[in-house]
Amino acid sequence: MIQMQSTLDVACNSGARRVQCIKVLGGSHRRYAGIGDIIKVSVKEAIPRAKAKKGDVYNAVVVRTKKGVRRPDGSVIRFDRNAAVLLNANLAPIGTRIFGPVTRELRTEQFMKIVSLAPEVL
């Protein structure tokens, strides 16, 4: 469950290391974002000489949350940290690699590129 001011790890090689959620997209009074939701983020920590710089604002898709996601069979998939993948204006991933596992809930037409780049799909 991600809300405004939440900090997330970045699960791609775009150069950003930590980002902060500045807006949950998808409604004027939408409060929380879960796995597969798009948020607006600001880069708070980045590595030198990378594409994403500190202070840049991007769209991002949430790929892992501590809250987790409940499956129709009743099981829950949870993670230790919150993580997101940075997206460009066309909602395509900026990085060329994805770090760590992602969930099957991302298997929509919009995020198949992220699922195919991920080392593990839970």
From Swiss-Prot:
Top-level taxon of origin: Bacteria
Pfam families recorded: Ribosomal_L14
Keyword terms: Ribonucleoprotein, Ribosomal protein, RNA-binding, rRNA-binding
GO biological process: translation
Annotated SUPFAM superfamilies: Ribosomal protein L14
Quaternary structure note: Part of the 50S ribosomal subunit. Forms a cluster with proteins L3 and L19. In the 70S ribosome, L14 and L19 interact and together make contacts with the 16S rRNA in bridges B5 and B8.
Record family assignment: Belongs to the universal ribosomal protein uL14 family.
Xref: NCBIfam families: rplN_bact
Its job: Binds to 23S rRNA. Forms part of two intersubunit bridges in the 70S ribosome.
PANTHER family named in the record: 50S/60S RIBOSOMAL PROTEIN L14/L23, LARGE RIBOSOMAL SUBUNIT PROTEIN UL14M
Protein name: Large ribosomal subunit protein uL14
Native species: Shewanella denitrificans (strain OS217 / ATCC BAA-1090 / DSM 15013)
Species lineage: Bacteria, Pseudomonadati, Pseudomonadota, Gammaproteobacteria, Alteromonadales
Gene that encodes it: rplN
